[in-house]
């Protein structure tokens, strides 16, 4: 018997308490749980009760809260369990350094960049749900993974679909990729209607169950903007090879077009566990308890071009792709600030794009990054400028 194949696979989940993290743990449970997987580390933020519960159920070796104020609470919850506890950015780094073979990168925002880079540098396979690694760090992140010797397996449903449909053996015949977008809750709204929408309305996605940040990003289509930039780096595409189409039913997750006119698409019910299961079992496929697609019940599949007047995020992504350099990092940082301002009711829904465009134009002359410190510097500059713009927006509301 080959004992190497019988050893549990070592996993770390960066961001286990969010939507992606909880779905990942469900997939792990379905695929055999502790009999097949050794959980090295779980990380979360403020929900330490859930984090502690997850750590106890999975037998994780380390539990980390990125909120240093929650360290004592987490330590108390895990007292006597034998599970190590850490906190803050140093705790995230400790989790990333543990010898996991496979790391789910699901921390939302720029906070997930450094620990994911650390895991990639030591050679782990990265199941990538964090958008900022590619949007902000781009080629630097790709190069880190290459040097480490691991793989990137996308977890976004759109990029997972492209990953599954893209034939690398015939890469020279690739013409385009088509990212599908649901259009979110405001697909049929006018700009006037969108001007006064609330946070609660914006977070109510018609198809997917997601966290607040991703739900608002779907409503504004900034999620799709980030995915366009991700796709460029992940699949080594030119800007004109990247298309976006609105598909309200979210059944076709994305498509790849080839030079002979063929288009390959990946279909399925909207359930993140499918993409997570593929990332965890790649290059095989897992047997998962998810709903199956019933074609007899599909009344129709609709497609429409995105309205760039109502959803300028797509236009801003194209600008970032054309400018290159650090524009992705700038767009991402400005969007995070604009999102926070909208959630805190400092600016309106449509003003988020105004903030991002101002910051991108203001910092359009930044030199390309040569080291990761350049990315963090651009991120800081963009956030400072965004806060200035948000302050002025608030005064004029």
From Swiss-Prot:
EC number(s) recorded for this UniProt protein = 1.1.1.267
Q: Key word Oxidoreductase present in the record?
A: yes
Metabolic or biological pathway, per its Swiss-Prot or TrEMBL entry = Isoprenoid biosynthesis; isopentenyl diphosphate biosynthesis via DXP pathway; isopentenyl diphosphate from 1-deoxy-D-xylulose 5-phosphate: step 1/6
Q: Which cofactor does it need?
A: Mg(2+); Mn(2+)
Annotated 1-deoxy-D-xylulose 5-phosphate binding sites: 131, 157-158, 182, 205, 218, 223-224, 227
> Which residues does NADPH bind?
17-20, 47, 130, 132, 211
What's the domain of life for this entry?
Answer: Bacteria
The UniProt catalytic activity note for this protein reads:
2-C-methyl-D-erythritol 4-phosphate + NADP(+) = 1-deoxy-D-xylulose 5-phosphate + NADPH + H(+)
Listed NCBIfam families = Dxr
PANTHER family xrefs: 1-DEOXY-D-XYLULOSE 5-PHOSPHATE REDUCTOISOMERASE, 1-DEOXY-D-XYLULOSE 5-PHOSPHATE REDUCTOISOMERASE, CHLOROPLASTIC
The protein, known as:
1-deoxy-D-xylulose 5-phosphate reductoisomerase
């Amino acid at each position: 018997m080959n004992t190497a194949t019988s050893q549990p696979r070592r996993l770390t989940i960066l961001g286990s308490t969010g939507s992606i993290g909880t779905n990942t743990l469900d997939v792990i449970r379905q695929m055999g749980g502790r009999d097949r997987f050794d959980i090295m580390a779980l990380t979360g933020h403020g929900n330490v009760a859930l984090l502690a519960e997850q750590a106890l159920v999975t037998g994780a070796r380390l539990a980390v809260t990125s909120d240093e104020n929650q360290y004592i609470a987490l330590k108390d919850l895990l007292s006597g369990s034998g599970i190590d506890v850490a906190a803050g950015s140093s705790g995230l780094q400790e989790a990333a350094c543990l010898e996991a073979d496979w790391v789910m990168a699901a921390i939302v925002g720029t906070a997930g960049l450094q620990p994911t880079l650390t895991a990639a540098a030591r050679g782990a396979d990265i199941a990538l749900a964090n958008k900022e690694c590619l949007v902000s760090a781009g080629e630097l992140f790709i190069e880190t993974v290459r040097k480490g010797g691991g793989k990137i397996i996308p977890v976004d449903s759109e990029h997972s679909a492209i990953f599954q449909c893209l034939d690398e053996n015939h890469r020279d015949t690739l013409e385009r990729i088509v990212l599908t977008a649901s259009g979110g809750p405001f697909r049929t709204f006018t700009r006037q209607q969108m001007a006064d929408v609330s946070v609660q309305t914006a977070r109510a996605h018609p198809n997917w169950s997601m966290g607040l940040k991703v739900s608002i990003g779907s409503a504004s289509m900034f999620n799709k903007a980030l995915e366009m930039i991700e796709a460029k780096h992940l699949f080594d595409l030119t800007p004109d090879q990247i298309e976006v189409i609105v598909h309200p039913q979210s059944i076709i997750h994305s498509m790849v077009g080839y030079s002979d006119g063929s288009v390959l698409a990946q279909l399925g019910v909207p359930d993140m566990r499918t993409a997570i299961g593929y990332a965890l079992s790649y290059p095989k496929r897992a047997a998962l308890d998810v709903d199956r697609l019933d074609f007899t019940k599909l009344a129709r599949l609709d497609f429409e071009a995105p309205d760039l007047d109502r959803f300028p995020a797509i236009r801003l992504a194209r600008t970032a792709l054309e400018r290159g350099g650090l524009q992705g990092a700038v767009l991402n940082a400005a969007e995070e600030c604009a999102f926070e301002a909208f959630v805190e009711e400092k600016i309106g829904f449509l003003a988020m794009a105004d903030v991002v465009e101002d910051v991108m134009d203001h910092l359009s002359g930044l030199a390309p990054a040569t080291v990761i410190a350049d990315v963090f510097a651009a991120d800081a500059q963009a956030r400072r400028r965004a806060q200035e713009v948000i302050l002025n927006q608030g005064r004029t509301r």
